[in-house]
């Protein structure tokens, strides 16, 4: 990411969920705290909560959200028995004089993962309800969707005005990203467990609208040297 940021100032680093809870030692050992610290070091701009993240429990998850130096989103998760959202539904970022909305959607398995402490509302209905509000505030709309590829293919026809969907939950790799010609929506997904990184470049026209895109999926092999700062951070957990 440091190399990418050297060549472009207009970069968003996003995560599509199931990142804080997992079977890997670092996540289990620290209940996701080290993951958040690493994401802070990398300069993440936003992530969406995945269903597995709720296995940490709400109290621990709230602590991780406080530690994060970036917004952790979910527009469709509410505390059981209330209409109170558990997380921020969306955030507006200003990138190169363009206002970019980033919305988070969590799959409905989150409710069982949290032991019934939360309810995951219908994500499509939630998105439709949000789009008018968000479209008035932003030039570009990105959805961080922890719903899986099949659901992501349906989103552009269910809610107009989405420019980019960054997908998680399913293990699909879309290489290159798909383009929904009818809606103009780009759909990107890069697999799971940090094995790959998806890169999408959006071209903006003079009206502040998306006029084109390019995308690729990069496999993170040993040819990429360790970042010294990140290596030093990880070494403290050995």
Regions found by a protein language model. Name each.
Residues 1-238:
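Acidic, metal/ion-coordinating pockets
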